[in-house]
Amino acid sequence: MTGTLPTQFKDSDLSPLTRPNALGRFGKYGGQYVPETLIPALIELEQAAKEAWKDSSFNSELNHLLKTYVGRSTPLYEATRLTEHYRKNTLKGPRIWLKREDLNHTGAHKINNALGQALLAIRMGKKRIIAETGAGQHGVATATVCARFGLECIIYMGKEDMRRQALNVFRMQLLGASVRPVTSGTATLKDATSEAIRDWVTNVETTHYILGSVAGPHPYPMLVRDFHAVIGEETKQQCKQAFGRSPDVLLACVGGGSNAMGLFHSFVEDKSVRMIGVEAAGDGVETGRHAATITEGRVGVLHGAMSLLLQDKDGQVEEAHSISAGLDYPGVGPEHSYLKEIGRAEYAAVTDTEAIEALQLVSKLEGIIPALETAHAFAYLEKLCPTLNHNSEIVINCSGRGDKDVNTVAEKLGSEI
């Protein structure tokens, strides 16, 4: 199964659980808090997306490229040794399955969205593409599809993230992208996003902004989710083939939240399926050096949308911290804030140390080196597994591979490469 028509455009009578309202809001979250100059571009983008999903030629091209270029569908893999590890003492605990988004072309889920938005940009006649990136995976995916379609590509990346993710910086440059360092603030993802938005305001007539997460102004949270919904659609079918029913638990890391929403979306209305997002607790939530936005955040506006944000007592957005560049963000997608508020999804946070330990464990037990972002989801198994019985089935979104993080992990462990 690849790239089927997203639920968003199949039925005008969908419940509020599966789509934003006419104002682009999930409950009170979302909206369009942007300069007037961007409103026409956002309207154009939403209209182009609606028309594209109804166009059989667009769907055919997207599905063909998802299959032959990206490599979908990605497998659902039974992690038998990881399952045994958590069952060894108590003989209870879930059977663990991995949705292998790390096997996509470019090594992460990000290309699902980058490919779809590139096709929309071409449809709108936009030949200049900009994007923000933290861990570099969205930047690499965007540079990849721009190379595929012959589009100009500019990537904004915080200087600190460029240091942490030097391999991905070179990959982007090798693919023909111009990588522009951002030195403001903490020189990480929030600052790169702000710089990309400034570029877009200036060049809105000729430029499409391929936003990399389910954040930002409407229609981006909906659009990015819908391009990633293939993850959950495939998972639902694969689970039925593997064990005859839907899983009991879905587990995914959450920064902005695109990989999690891609997995969750097809299951949102099935209340029998628990959905758990795992944020970055950094040095520990109690230290103030973390990126646990849903756990510790308050309602505010950042990058064009109302959502939960890390803020100080005066309402100023605080700096986030995580060893994972892809989770190092003080906001979260508005749909996640909504799902948390209505009690449909659960959210937890794990520390840098816990994520590093989980990365090592999964590598040694399954021969799969997950990205540091993904390792946060794996780390939560330590707390989750003892609470589940042996008949439970859990699916973890293995959102990316860890090649890009080897230097960071080695440095953290005191090893030299």
Swiss-Prot record:
Keywords: Amino-acid biosynthesis, Aromatic amino acid biosynthesis, Lyase, Pyridoxal phosphate, Tryptophan biosynthesis. InterPro entries: Trp_synth_b_CS, Trp_synth_beta, Trp_synth_beta/beta-like, TrpB-like_PALP, TrpB-like_PALP_sf. GO terms for molecular function: tryptophan synthase activity. It catalyses: (1S,2R)-1-C-(indol-3-yl)glycerol 3-phosphate + L-serine = D-glyceraldehyde 3-phosphate + L-tryptophan + H2O. GO terms for cellular component: cytoplasm. The keyword Transmembrane helix does not apply. The keyword Oxidoreductase does not apply. Its EC number is 4.2.1.20. The modification N6-(pyridoxal phosphate)lysine is found at residue 110. Tetramer of two alpha and two beta chains. The beta subunit is responsible for the synthesis of L-tryptophan from indole and L-serine. Pathway: Amino-acid biosynthesis; L-tryptophan biosynthesis; L-tryptophan from chorismate: step 5/5. Its cofactor is pyridoxal 5'-phosphate. This is Tryptophan synthase beta chain. Gene3D superfamilies: 3.40.50.1100. It is an enzyme of class 4 (lyase). NCBIfam families: trpB. Belongs to the TrpB family.
